[in-house]
Amino acid sequence: MSRPNILFITTDEQHLRTLSCYGCRTETTPCLDALADNADVYETAYTVSPVCLPARCAFMTGMYPHHSGSISNIFGASLSLQFPNLFTELKKQGYRTALHGKCHFIPVPYPATRGDMTLEYEHFIAYYKLLGMDKLSLQDDKNNSLWYYDDYAKDLARQGMLRKCRYEAHENPENHGYYDFPFETPMHPDAWVGQRAVEDIESRSADENNFIWVSFSGPHYPVDTPAEYTDRIDENKLEPRIFREDEWDDDSKYHVRGYHGPGTTEGSGHAKDGAQKNYSEDYWIQWRRRYFGNIALIDEWVGKILDAARAKFGENLLVIFTADHGEMMGNHSLWGKNGALFEDVLRIPLIVQRPGQKEGRRIPETVSSLELFPTILTCAGAPVPDHADGVTLDEMVQQGGRPFIISECDNRAVILKDSVKVEYNRPNLRGKMYRELYDLREDPDEFENRFDDPRYAGTIRELTALLEAEPDLMETVFRPYADGGDYWLNDGTGAGFAFNGAKPE
C-alpha cells in the first residue's frame, strides 16, 4: 500500500470521560465511538502539558516543552522555526499539508486584547504559514477569534455577526462562562472548522499524499454551545462530579485560592468573589450540559469529516483523534484547565485507526502525546528527527509503556511513576511553593496530599531525581519569577511582540 493519507483530528480541553468508549454514560459521541470500534484505543495516554500552546507545540515537534522552549501560553514560548515540524517533514515526502481551526503555536499578547474591539492578526497568520502549511483556515481559539481578525473572525464580520459574538463572549453580564451561541449553528466556530475541513477533503486528489489537521477549538471555554445541542443533554445522564466538601480545607494544594478565592484561573473569573466554591449545583448542571453539548456538535462533524475522507481516500487512511489536554469539568469543584495537574487535565483520549484496520483494540500501556510526532512521520515514510523526545506508539507499547510521565507548563511540573505522582510549582510572588503527592492506587480521585507523609520519602527522592536529570526542565519551569520579565511577549501595547525564532517581515 502507498503512503497513507493522514487525518489528524484534535479537540481543545476535552475530558477523557466525555466519550462512551472511555466509559462516559452521557452518550454524546456516537461517531467517535464508532471509530473506536475499529481502531486502537489508548487507555492511558497523557498530555505533555496541561495548557494549550506547549501541548500543541509538542504535537508539532515531538519535544518536551522544556526542550523546545514552548513552555507557556503567555511567556516567550512560540514554536521556533529552527525545529523540523510535522508540516516541514511531511512536505519533504511530497505531502500536501493543511490545518483547519486552531493553531496557537504563538503566545497571544493578552494585555493588548480588548472586549470591545477586534485587532489585526496578520503577523500571526504570516508566522503560521512559515511553519509549512500549504493551506490554512484559521479559527485560532474561541476567544482569539473575537480579539483578533483570523479567518473565522473575518467571516463573522462579513456577515455582520462579529459584534454580537464579541458582546456575548466578553461584555454580556449574563455570561457566566457559558452562553447560547447567538446565531445559526453553521456559524459556530466548531461547525465552521468542520465545514472547511470537509470542503478541503472533497477537493483533494486520492492520487496525492495528503496531511489534514482538523483542529477544533471546542469544547474549550467559553462554552458557547448552540441551544439545540444543549437541549440534547439530559442532566440526569451527566457524569457525576467528583468532589469532597472538605478537600480544600488543606491549604497545601496549589488550587486552594481558585476554590476559596480570590483565584485568577479560568473558572474563578466568573465566580462571585473569584471563588469557585460559590457556584451552585444548578450552575454546574447548566455549565456541564453545554460542555457536553459542544462535544456532541463536534462529534457530528467528526462523523462528516470521516465520511468525506473515506469516500475520497478509501482505506489508505491513517486517522488519529486526540485532545491537547483535558478539563476539570466540575471535578474538585473547579472548571477550566487552570494549569492543573489532576488526572482530569493530564489524561487525554487517543484513538488511532491504521489504514485498513477493521478491528478494535484496547491498549493499556502508558503513552504520551510525544509519541504522535514520530508515529505520524514513520507512517508517512519520513525519518524522525533526532530532537524528538518520543518514539512511535508501536515502539512504546512494545517497550511496555513509558516508565514515567512528565507533564509541565510555565511554572509547574508533575512526574508520575507507578501510580504515584509528585507535583512541584515555582515559588509564587508571595514566596509560596506548593508541593503535592497523590497515590492513585489508594486515592484515585486525588483528594489527599501525601507529600509530607514519611512513607513516601523514598518515592519523593526517586521522582525528584528524575526531574533533576532534566536540567532544561529545572531552568525553565522553576526559574524564579523575578527572572521572567525579559521573556514576557508583550509590552501592553501590542507593539512589543517577540517570536522565539525569526519574525516575518
Predicted regions and their residues:
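Formylglycine-dependent sulfatase
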Residues: 1-425, 431-433, 444-465, 493-505
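Short hydrophobic beta-strand that contains or immediately precedes a catalytic carboxylate
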Residues: 437-438
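Short, charged, surface-exposed hinge/linker loops at domain edges
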Residues: 476-496
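A contiguous, mid-protein "functional segment" used to position or interact
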Residues: 454-483
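Residues forming the ATP-binding cleft of Hanks-type serine/threonine protein kinase domains
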Residues: 441
